[in-house]
Curated annotation (Swiss-Prot):
Underlying gene: spb4
Source species taxonomy: Eukaryota, Fungi, Dikarya, Ascomycota, Pezizomycotina
Coiled coil: 558-620
Binding site for ATP: A58, V59, T60, G61, S62, G63, K64, T65
A GO cellular component entry from the record: 90S preribosome
Residue ranges of the motif Q motif: 14-42
Major place of residence: nucleus
Record-given protein name: ATP-dependent rRNA helicase spb4
InterPro entries assigned to the protein according to its UniProt record, in alphabetical order: CTT_SPB4, DEAD/DEAH_box_helicase_dom, Helicase_ATP-bd, Helicase_C-like, P-loop_NTPase, RNA-helicase_DEAD-box_CS, RNA_helicase_DEAD_Q_motif, SPB4-like_CTE
Location of the Helicase C-terminal domain: 279-437
Localization per record: Nucleus, Nucleolus
Keywords: ATP-binding, Coiled coil, Helicase, Hydrolase, Nucleotide-binding, Nucleus, Ribosome biogenesis, RNA-binding, rRNA processing
Enzyme Commission number, as recorded: 3.6.4.13
Function summary: ATP-binding RNA helicase involved in the biogenesis of 60S ribosomal subunits. Binds 90S pre-ribosomal particles and dissociates from pre-60S ribosomal particles after processing of 27SB pre-rRNA. Required for the normal formation of 18S rRNA through the processing of pre-rRNAs at sites A0, A1 and A2, and the normal formation of 25S and 5.8S rRNAs through the processing of pre-rRNAs at sites C1 and C2.
Any one GO MF annotation of this record: ATP hydrolysis activity
Amino acid sequence: MAIEGEKKKDPRAWDALTPSLAEWVLDAISSMGFEKMTPVQASTIPLFMGNKDVVVEAVTGSGKTLSFLIPVVEKLLRLEEPLKKHHVGAIIVSPTRELATQIHSVLTSLLKFHEPSAEALQPLEEGEKRKPSSTLRVIPQLLLGGTTTPAQDLSRFLKNSPNLLISTPGRLLELLSSPHVHCPQSSFEVLVLDEADRLLDLGFKDDLQKILGRLPKQRRTGLFSASVSEAVGEIVRVGLRNPVKIAVKVKGAGGGDKMTPASLQMSYLLTPPTHKFPALLSLLSQLEPTPQKSIIYLSTCAAVDYFQPLLEAVLPKQFGLVSLHGKHPPNVRQRNFSKYVAAVSPTILLTTDVAARGLDIPQVDLVVQIDPPSDPKVFLHRCGRAGRAGRKGLSVIFLQPGREEDYIPFLEIRKTPITPLKRPEISTTGEAAKILISKMRKEVLSDRALYDKGQRAFVSWVQAYSKHQASSIFRVADLDWTDLGNAWALVRLPKMPELKKWEGDKTLGIKLDMSEYAYKDKIREKARRVAMEEAKNAGPYVPTEEQIAKKKQREAWSQKHEKQDLKELKREKKKRKREIERLEKMTDEEKKEEQAKEKELQDLIEQVKKRKIEDDADVEFEGFAD
């Protein structure tokens, strides 16, 4: 019986865990500012520490990283004796370099509070090797493809003898293939697969199976995933032993499941293309307090490269801007990402879907989607970069008035409701839009290199728009080309198939002598002028024999297909004629039976379609990766 007046311990208090955490872990968590466990931490940590395999499904910002790092560290520090040299005790597998780097960063922040491990984190001198120690400690090694070579990774492994590896699948597999790296049953304790669904989406299934094959079956395994799809289920069956499934849901206002944390507000703003960037600037300047970390999403890598210098020219001075996309070299991606994370003043990350999942960037206050993603599943993961770990966050998507408004009920069906943005109240005028476009266009006119980037970026954007999975909502045929061209601060619309039949002004009313439009780079400009002079003196164009032969080949191929199309048309006409003759010979009773069968078939098709839509709604959006 409880003593009267005795306070009941909060089940989400860190010191309420059983088995209890080490004092230094509690100190580390307190210094990180985490007063209480999140529901996923309270559910996962005791089970994972208590020798259970776990499959964890939870929304974004739910604290999954600490849910596996704390049990992994505790397991390694509760061994009876230190592991032998070059023996690995734990492995954490991540789908991307950025996420692996994040996990390693959180781990090192944790280990700074454990004195023996903190000492082991200090870099060794040239030629020095890690001395064996009788004290238990955690020595991590981060393995990333594209930043170091496999030989350098192995050399570092042999020098430091780490007992915990954090890696992307390919680089991990290369290291495990070395005869100098040992993961025997006597040493290996735990495997963590973070973002398991993302690992499989990126095609790492074969690598994962090979990794599992190199590890002892008697081990603890934790699988952390946004959704447990059939493919993830297969990994569960092969790699886990009687796992406990933990699914943490968030309830919406109507009592149904929501795919986002309660601290995240997801809104939309209806705005024509030319008003998108004025609306963005208005949002950044009106939000109170000023967002410290913001993420702006664009559709393509080329668009990020084009808009970065334009936004730098028009953004308020207090905001820094960093770009990140999948076509950046690995060292540039890593440098830019680190710069963004470490920024102490308000900073914006201009990016593509490379930053839509897995990145646990602290203090992201605002996410703005200038372009809706081609894949509706990604919408959730973009939003989920804000509002993490209970912190308030705002996500805003810009939609064009008209057909794009259908995206709102489309998301509602998928349990992802978005509401109109009411605070701050954003209103933009045509005059403000003209002034901003003029400033951006001034940048474009200052360097022909930006003109080239704009042409490529606009074409890539149109291609991305045309491939949207919600193709009935996002239709190229509905686009206002003049408004779009001005919104992009273009000085010419590019040549592309979509504009062949368009009769508008492709110069957008800009008078420009293209022959005098120069590159800032003197070498490029000199090369352009030389090429221009050569073309002027070259005389009339005469095709080569090879070009003539290719043209004939294309014409022959085209004629062949025309004949095939004609035959197909004749067959279709004959088929329709036979069907009409068959129906004419039928009695009224037979016709009624035929119509009944046709209706039954149509009903069946509709049922299947409806079931597929419902299944898609359940499967596509089952939460976020952390």
